[in-house]
Structure formats: C-alpha cells, structure tokens
Amino acid sequence: MSDSAHTGPTVDASGTEVDVVIVGGGPAGLSAALNLGRARASVVVVDAGRPRNAATLRSHGFLTRDGIPPLELRKLARAELAAYRNVRVFDRTAVSGLLSTDSADGMRFVVALQGRGPGIPPAVAARSVLIATGLRETLPGIPSLRAYYGVTIFSCAACDAWELQDRSLALIGETTDLAARARLIARWTDRLTVFTNGSDAVDTVEEAELTASGIVVERRAIDDLEGERGAVSAVRLADGERVEIEGGFVRPQWHPALDFVTALDLERDRFGNLVTDRSGRTSVTGVYAAGDAASPGPQQLIVAAGQGARAAAVIVHDSIGVRTAH
C-alpha cells in the first residue's frame, strides 16, 4: 500500500501527544484500546457517544455475554480500561479533522477535536491513528419503523434471528442484496415475506427463485407498521391491506462515518468504506481501520472486537518494525 499522505493546515496539539488515537468508542475501538494499553502504548479514545446499536435491547453472539444490552457491554469495557492509566477516553467528543504532519519527534498525525466534555484539548498529536467509527444507517421511510427497531424488527440476522425462529417474519428493504438476505433469514423460518416497498430491489429471476423456496415477495408500497409497545403485528400496505407478522428484519442503507478524513488520501471502495489489507492497514502508513469503517462483513459486536484486537497487535508490531500479517 502507498505510504503517501497529504499535509494539511496546522492545528495546535502542543502538550497532548500519544502513541495512538482511536476514533470510535464501540467494540472495535475499545478492544483495540485495551490491547494497546496492555502493550504499554499511550492511547486516547475519542468517543462521540452515538452508537448505531443504541436502540437494541439485547446483543447476541458475544461469547460469555450473550443477551447483554449493548450499552452495558460498553460500560463493562470502559470499566476495564479505567485500570490502565496510559489509556484515556474523551467522551462526547467528535473528530473534526485528521491531518498529516512531518514532526521530527515521530508524531505523524494531528487529530482535531470538538469536545463537549470538560478538559478536552483542541487537538491530539499521534504516531498512529485507528479509525473505528463504524457506519451510519438510513432506514426505509416507514413512519413508525423506529418504534419497533431493536425490539422486534432488527437488521442483523446472525445477531437476532434465533429469538424470532419459526415465526411469521418480514424482511423490508430497497437494496439490491435483498434476495440474498431473504435466503439467509429463511434458515430460521419458513414463513417469510419480502417487502420491497415499491422498489425494484428484487428482480424477476430472484423473485422466481425465492417463490420456489416458499418465500413470498410483496412489491406494493408500505403505508406503515402496526403493533403495540415495540411488538410489531402487521405490515399495512398503501392500499390498506394488512399482512400479519410476528417480527422481522430491515435492510438499512449504510454509510461510512468518515467525514473527518478528507484531508488524507485514503483509498476507499465503491461504497465509500476504507480499503485495508488483512491486518487493518489503510493506504496511508500509520492509519489503520477496524470494524465497519473498513469494508464491512458480519454486523456482530464480537467480530468488531476481534478486528480491534488484531489491529492493536499490528500497530504495536509496526511501531517497532516487526512486519506481521496477523
């Protein structure tokens, strides 16, 4: 990968210098912070405090923590980090810019901050930066969808389908991978209806394949969802017809949260995610990515945490010139 970076405008980071700045306080960022702290690196974690899974009541598939509320998992992780004096967490703080520098003392980056908490400096200088900001998501424009999201409507089959198995389920989406997601969800139920909400997300060949598998494809536009206290009970179509369901999944449109990296020439894929090698190195030396900020795979906390731990090990090895693939 290229070693090039663009030098940006000067930002005063005097007095605040660390080995690594981690942008993002989710499972990838916190896991990396723990492992970097244990490697005696000085670390700052910048956490805006807006996790994508904030609406989720229970997280699943995390070994020893199956069913834990995601906010509780973050609380436990933060308590563990408190034991490492070389790790600091800047709460309610956003990164407004990531700039390269040619400092003689090895500080290759300046991370400009916008903090709402007390004692947040305007910037931090760092030898390396790990981007673990995850994704932003946009849900289909269904009025009451948010009322059920994270309770009986979910986005991750691997995370939440077990609790919905053998029920009448909906899959709602407007993206071209909807048929593939339907085939995945069908592992857990034989009563699945795919709602394209008036879009052409499922083509005629895919519809025939899904129908042959017992999956119903409903192309009419959705008016709204029905239910009480987060428990969805029906999809109401624009013509007034109701399709009763007992839960379901939605396919959001995901967008990388990377507005702050525009000053660096970081390679992106066609979806705007950061391109990395298998160890989390981006196209700019000293900048790494973990979790969904890089090309996303399974949307699970344990996967993101594992990627953060691997990136931490690679950062430590790279800092002493020990090249490793990990």
Describe each PLM feature range:
Residues S2-V20, V89-R167, L274-R278, T282:
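FAD-binding core/adjacent interface of flavoenzyme oxidoreductases
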Residues V18-E72, R167-S168, D177-D200:
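Beta1-alpha1 glycine-rich phosphate/pyrophosphate-binding loop at the start
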